[in-house]
């Protein structure tokens, strides 16, 4: 690879982060938007994958801030502006989608409603209720977001916590559809440059032969 081609290619770290996040996002969008038909054993990894996406995205942002990305290939000004906007929104989605999911989990009640406890107890005392725990890859417990979990300690906390859970569940699902739309735009733009403009766009992310020159005007 010559120097000019190397300048148009992302670093190996950026390429790894890009494809690792892409695969995890594809898994999560599939298991999330199709959760009614996805086997429970497969969906069990949805949360672990989401937390991993959040961590890798933070690493990717840190890497991007400390390592200048390569210049864009030649394109019209409107395409350049569109690419910048879509990239920014994708980063927002990679952060907000896992965070809304985390908030939803944090709004999961640690204890059943008092009425349910009394109904189950019968003549005998109810057994101790185990707090709901979310394991990440079976290695550690995902802590709850304290401001949300503490809602349970407020007057009428059970009802408020349920409302909060439903709110973030709706937001999380909405983020999934927004994320899917952004990915369609991102992939469509990349394929347009690769197949129609005959530019080696995919080579910038490690697929195929590298591009040969940059657009000096960008």
Give, region by region, the residue ranges found by the protein language model.
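Membrane-embedded alpha-helical bundles that constitute the cytochrome b-like, heme-associated redox core
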Residues: 1-218
């Amino acid at each position: 690879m010559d120097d000019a081609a190397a300048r148009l290619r992302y670093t190996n770290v950026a390429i790894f982060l890009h494809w690792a996040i892409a695969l995890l996002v594809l898994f999560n969008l599939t298991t999330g938007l199709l959760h009614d038909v996805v086997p429970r054993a497969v969906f069990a990894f949805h949360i672990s994958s989401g937390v991993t996406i959040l961590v890798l995205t933070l690493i990717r942002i840190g890497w991007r801030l400390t390592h200048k990305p390569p210049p864009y290939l030649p394109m019209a000004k409107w395409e350049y502006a569109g690419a910048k906007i879509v990239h920014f929104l994708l980063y927002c989605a990679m952060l907000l989608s896992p965070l809304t999911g985390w908030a939803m989990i944090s709004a999961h009640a640690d204890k059943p409603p008092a009425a349910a406890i009394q109904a189950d107890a019968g003549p005998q005392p109810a057994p101790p209720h185990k707090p709901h725990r979310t394991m990440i890859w079976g290695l550690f417990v995902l802590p709850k977001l304290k401001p949300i979990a503490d809602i349970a300690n407020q007057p009428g906390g059970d009802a408020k916590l349920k409302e909060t859970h439903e709110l973030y569940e709706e937001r999380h699902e909405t983020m999934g559809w927004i994320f899917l739309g952004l990915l369609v735009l991102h992939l469509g733009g990349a394929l347009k440059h690769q197949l129609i403009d005959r530019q080696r766009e995919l080579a910038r992310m490690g697929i195929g032969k590298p591009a040969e020159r940059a657009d000096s005007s960008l």
